[in-house]
């Protein structure tokens, strides 16, 4: 079993983001990834990771109003595991690799192949932005983050688009606002890195948020889900070899 700590915050308490790679116990095993709901811990990260290695997990492929999901049941040993969520659901589209199939409605016993623990700031200092492009009210534009990485192993640049939010802007103002957004982002974000959670996330630490970012307080860590965009690559490989270069912002008319 492989295990990794992605350390973005060294204080106590911290928010734990746990993702686990699994393989089905079956003659034709499926490989899948599940991620636990965020939880807060004061246990040192190496100790928490050791206790996570005792995880036993079952999944069940089923349906929900949001689409196909995996219902996850988990158990683990250790005092720190009392804070670990034990029952939850994850998107099957992100959890399953493109070659794997699970039988609908059947309880699946899984072996743990790798565990990723990312330490984030405490509750109240972490803001999670979902990649959800559904309309909200009378919005005119979508704010998109273009996350530029380089594969340091191959020297290949990669750009991942991530939906941030819907905004209302007049067409006559869009060019000016887009220029301002770019400037605001340059000043607002002091650090950005990727980590394995919900497939993959971009963690941005905000320094001096203003303008379109002003609702995010200074010192906040902002999480943007990237998982749906990178299913073709091994998450472990991405975390080891992709280096974040910059994040640009653009407005797209609806």
Swiss-Prot record:
Topology relative to the membrane: Peripheral membrane protein
Q: Which UniProt keywords apply?
A: Host cell membrane, Host cytoplasm, Host membrane, Host nucleus, Membrane, Viral matrix protein, Virion
Does the keyword field hold Membrane?
Answer: yes
One Pfam family per UniProt: Matrix_Pneumo_N
- One record GO biological process: virion assembly
Indicate where this protein resides in the cell. Virion; Host cytoplasm; Host nucleus; Host cell membrane
Q: Which InterPro entries match?
A: Matrix_Pneumo_C, MATRX_N_pneumovirus, Pneu_matrix_N
Q: What coarse category fits the chief subcellular location reported for this protein?
A: virion
* Superkingdom of the organism of origin: Viruses
What's this protein's function?
Answer: Plays a crucial role in virus assembly into filaments and budding. Early in infection, localizes in the nucleus where it may inhibit host cell transcription. Later in infection, traffics to the cytoplasm to associate with inclusion bodies, the site of viral transcription and replication. During virus assembly and budding, acts as a bridge between the nucleocapsid and the lipid bilayer.
Which family is this sequence assigned to?
Belongs to the pneumovirinae M protein family.
Q: Give the protein's recorded name.
A: Matrix protein
What organism does the UniProt record list as the source? Turkey rhinotracheitis virus (TRTV)
| Gene encoding the protein | M
């Amino acid at each position: 079993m492989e295990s990794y700590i992605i350390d973005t915050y060294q204080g106590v308490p911290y928010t734990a983001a746990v993702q686990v790679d699994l393989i089905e116990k079956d003659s034709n095993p499926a490989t899948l990834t599940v991620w636990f709901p965020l939880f807060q811990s004061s246990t040192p990260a190496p100790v928490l990771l050791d206790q996570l290695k005792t995880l036993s997990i079952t999944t069940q492929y089923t349906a929900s109003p949001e689409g196909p999901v995996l219902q996850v049941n988990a158990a683990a040993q250790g005092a720190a595991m009392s804070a670990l969520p034990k029952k939850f659901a994850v998107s099957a589209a992100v959890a399953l690799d493109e070659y794997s199939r699970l039988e609908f409605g059947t309880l699946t016993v899984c072996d743990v192949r790798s565990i990723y623990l990312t330490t984030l700031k405490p509750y109240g200092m972490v803001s999670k932005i979902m990649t959800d492009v559904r309309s909200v009210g009378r919005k005119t534009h979508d704010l998109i983050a273009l996350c530029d990485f380089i594969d340091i192993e191959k020297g290949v640049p990669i750009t991942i688009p991530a939906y941030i939010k819907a905004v209302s802007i007049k067409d006559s103002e869009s060019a000016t606002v887009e220029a301002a957004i770019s400037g605001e982002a340059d000043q607002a974000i002091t650090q950005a890195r990727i980590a394995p959670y919900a497939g993959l996330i971009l963690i941005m630490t905000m320094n001096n948020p203003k303008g379109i970012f002003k609702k995010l307080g200074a010192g906040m860590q902002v999480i943007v889900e990237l998982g749906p965009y990178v299913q073709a690559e091994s998450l472990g490989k991405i975390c080891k070899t992709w280096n974040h270069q910059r994040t640009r912002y653009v407005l797209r008319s609806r």
